[in-house]
Regions:
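A short, small-residue-rich loop immediately preceding and capping a beta-strand
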Residues: 40, 64-67, 113, 134-151, ...
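Glycine-rich ThDP/TPP pyrophosphate-binding loop and its adjacent helix/strand module
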Residues: 110-266, 272-274, 284-288, 293-295, ...
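Peripheral docking tails and interdomain loops at the edges
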Residues: 271-282, 396-398, 418, 537, ...
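Non-catalytic terminal/interface segments that mediate subunit docking, oligomerization
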Residues: 65, 250-368, 373-383, 482-484
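Acidic-glycine-rich active-site phosphate/pyrophosphate-binding loop
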Residues: 19-30, 80, 84-106, 314-329, ...
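Cofactor-binding active-site loop characterized by glycine-rich and histidine/acidic residues
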Residues: 41-164, 309, 323-324
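A glycine-rich helix N-cap at a beta->alpha junction
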Residues: 87-97, 163-177, 379-391
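Glycine/charged-rich beta-loop-alpha catalytic/anionic-binding loops adjacent to active sites
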Residues: 29-36, 96-113, 135-141, 323-337, ...
């Protein structure tokens, strides 16, 4: 097997075309071996195998710099840069290799930590400028998928690359897909370029000032080598537009490109899930509710009664449970605006101003891409749009580029935004209905990320614009204020304290953005210690606001949350333990302070 011998992509330069095609086949099988056992991005990587082999055959990494956009197509690159063991070995070997471009893992060949989209051209222009200033001659190559071109930063990068005017190569990997289908006017031109084999009169890239080459056979190594050789050493901004097939070489991934963009482990022989145990048996898993399905079903029912209700997604419709069938059912009442969170935040503000009721579902990790628009375009204008925040907390994505721990500090720092944290399914939908029906302020709701928890207790249906905490149990001496996904943790801590003879007060704060001064003031009469629990970064978070409120008073405050940090591929229990957030650790800490 060739790929087991590859320690450097220079190995490829001694191979003939037949051998390069064997390397491509081995690389594809290695990628499939990994994703079938470990999960990960399937379709984008399979479609870029041949291009990666050709890139490393023609160019001279690490001297020449490859910059991957979003990293969804970087697995073949890892195989060919000495990391095949992370694709051929056991699951422990696979755990050692990130699913994203990572200099921490391989500083020689991975130039940037990358996981969010539309960044590669901008990053590459920085390398372009550095090369020009130093007077060196390396090729700078940005690799970007057609889906990532819907993000505004890609436009900014193209603009700057053209302005610099020196050699940079932008490889557009056009597989006619984002995660789902593409959305945006630029895709009309990409389609025209494909249909005309790059010869149509109106060429978006030429209008930017780029030299342009088109290759229809984007999964043909011989053709790829030819086109890459033709641009190697260019002294002009150049686009190489290659037409590839998402999922190429694996029939299930080709047949359902959206479903096979990313996935959990599967059975390689037929693509079925769940993956069988080593002894061939099928794991027994009980059907589980999920908030995406519940949300999309609820929205579709409500849409029939309210034609102004609009579901908004930004390139990730699955986050909202809007499958192809549900998108079709919603019709004009669902809009996906591509991977363009800045556009989404501003657009929902405009929708609300125009009399619509938009609900934008966005992953916690992507909120940081649009902080300014939420603050400026939405909150300053007090337009009553709803942001449905999914995946916030420790039980979510755990790669360093995708950690979902910062939404509370970010959103709660913006004046004029209400940020609600439901603790149960029933409370979530009550908050969602109120947020849609009210007409005074933008409201964000942090969807619980610890699974769907139900309650038989009645939930409030009105929430108001000033924070009002809900006292679930009145005790004394110790008060536990546990927000959102950590409310059940608060219940566990209160129960354990009871076993230690402490009757703790338990509070569901519901509001993350501000403090309920009346409730907090009332605790001063018969409490010595307030414990806050939040499922996210505590620096600048919910608990620190409560600690600030008590300030110079005699009240002790124990702030429970995750310390600010860039955590990579963390184990949830270890992260909780390292931050003293296991139930028993919290109890022991409380006992030390009373």
């Amino acid at each position: 097997m060739y790929i087991e011998k590859i320690k450097s992509p220079a190995f490829l330069k001694g191979l003939n075309l037949e051998e390069l095609n064997i390397v491509a086949d081995e690389t594809r099988q290695a990628v499939l071996n990994r994703v079938s056992k470990h999960g990960g991005h399937v379709g984008p990587n399979l479609g870029f195998v041949e291009a990666t082999v050709a890139l490393h055959y023609v160019f001279d990494a690490p001297k020449d710099k490859l910059v991957f956009d979003v990293s969804h197509q970087c697995y073949p690159h890892k195989v060919l840069t000495g990391r095949a063991s992370g694709f051929l070995g056991n699951v422990d070997d696979m755990n050692a290799i990130s699913g994203y471009s990572s200099p921490a893992e391989c500083p020689e060949y991975d130039n940037f930590e990358v996981g969010h989209t539309s960044t590669s051209i901008s990053l590459a222009t920085g390398l372009q400028k550095a090369r020009d200033i130093k007077g060196t001659d390396e090729n700078i190559i940005a690799i970007i998928g057609d889906g990532s071109l819907s993000g505004g930063e890609a436009f900014e990068g193209l603009d700057e690359a053209s302005e610099l005017g020196t050699g940079i190569i932008v490889i557009v990997n056009d597989n006619e897909m984002s995660i789902a289908e593409n959305h945006g006017g630029i895709y009309k031109n990409l389609r025209a370029l494909r249909e005309s084999r790059g010869t149509c009169e109106h060429n978006w890239f030429k209008a930017w000032g780029f030299e342009y080459k088109y290759l229809e056979e984007g999964n043909n190594i011989e053709k790829l080598i030819e086109v890459f050789k033709s641009v190697k050493g260019t002294d002009k901004p150049t686009v190489v537009h290659i037409h590839t097939e998402k999922g190429h070489g694996y029939a299930p991934a080709v047949a359902n490109k959206e479903a096979w963009h990313w996935g959990l482990p599967f059975n390689l022989e037929d693509g079925s899930r769940p993956r069988k145990n080593d002894n061939g048996t099928i794991p027994q898993t009980a059907p589980q509710e999920d908030y995406g399905t519940l949300f999309s079903d609820w929205m579709l029912r409500e849409m029939k009664q309210d034609k102004t209700l609009i579901a908004v997604t930004a390139g990730t419709p699955a986050a909202a449970g809007f499958t192809v069938d549900k998108r079709n059912e919603a019709g004009k009442q669902h809009i996906d605006i591509g991977i363009a969170e800045e556009q989404a935040a501003a657009m929902i503000s405009g929708m609300a101003k125009g009399g619509l009721h938009p609900v934008w579902t966005v992953y916690s990790t992507f909120i940081q891409r649009t902080y300014d628009q939420i603050a400026q375009d939405l909150c300053i204008n007090s337009n009553p749009a709803v942001i449905n925040v999914v995946g916030g907390g420790v039980n979510s994505m755990n790669d360093i580029t995708h950690i979902c721990l910062f939404d509370i500090p970010m959103l709660c720092s913006i004046p004029g935004l209400i940020y609600l944290a439901p603790t149960t399914c029933e409370e979530y939908f009550a908050m969602l209905r109120w947020a849609i029906q009210q007409d005074q302020k933008p409201v964000a709701i942090r969807v619980p990320s610890n699974g769907v928890v139900h309650t038989s207790e009645p939930v409030d249906t009105e929430y108001g614009y000033e924070p009002k905490y809900k006292v679930i149990h009145k005790g004394k001496n110790v008060a536990i204020i546990a927000a959102g996904s950590f409310f059940q943790k608060g219940e566990n801590v209160a129960r354990l304290l009871t076993e230690n003879g402490i009757n703790a007060t338990l509070i569901n704060p519901r509001y993350l953005n501000d403090v309920d001064t009346d409730t907090l003031e009332g605790l001063k009469t018969d409490h010595q210690l307030v414990v806050t629990l939040e499922d996210g970064c505590k620096d600048g978070g919910f608990g620190e606001r409560i600690a600030s409120f008590y300030g110079l008073s005699d009240m002790k405050v124990l702030v429970g949350g995750i310390k600010k940090g860039l955590y990579d591929r963390f184990d949830v229990n270890k992260l909780l333990s390292d931050n003293n957030l296991l139930d028993e650790q919290i109890v022991n800490e409380i006992l030390l302070h009373i």
